[in-house]
Amino acid sequence: DEVDRWSGFTTERDRLARTIDSLGLASNLVIVSGDAHMVAVDDGTHNTYGPGEGIGVPVVHAAALDRTGSVKGGPYALGTYPNRFSLRGANDGQYVQMAVSDAGGDEVCVTSTGRRWEYDTQQMVDLLSWSRCFPARLLEARPEPR
């Protein structure tokens, strides 16, 4: 029986992994998640994809706008920033802004900036910033793996 959470969808995860492999995309991939109620980034140092030693795949956690924070997984190369709870009755709010730069050249660059709106001080604070450029290439249409 499949359970309605990520760990329950083994068939779908396997299909997604086979599709990524068949297209050769693992080295050009950034995983974005919002489920952990924290801002955190790993540059691929601690998150590998594929058989054996695998390929380091960056992970960006981008949450939580208004929920009490938590830390899940890790370690993360750029640290973890769980959303803080304020004793004044409101949580801080935080998010990650992702900017993709594609000028039609040889590379596409992604910049992720984690920010927090501090309720107590009423100020925006930058938590972290991470950038990575990937080689730009056109993908050929291939049949879906079975």
Predicted feature descriptions by range:
Residues 1-146:
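Long, structured stretches of catalytic cores involved in phosphate-ester chemistry, encompassing
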